[in-house]
Amino acid sequence: MTNEMKTKMIARIHEEIADHNEYEMMSKEYDNPCRQVLHDIACDERTHAHHLYDILKRHNVELPVDLENKIKSM
């Protein structure tokens, strides 16, 4: 895996986490069924972040500690 790809994937994980957090906050502002739809979207974003994280881990990429902590707290 190239350094450029590692950098892009790490940046994308940060974006997926931010998206997850945004959709979760939005879901708390609505009643059903909108709440559930927004929560489901947040779950998808979390899944994307975890998949990218897993790919990097399989390639033995060392990740910043803050990113490790964010992933583990999701």
Language-model region placement:
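Non-heme di-metal
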Residues: 1-74
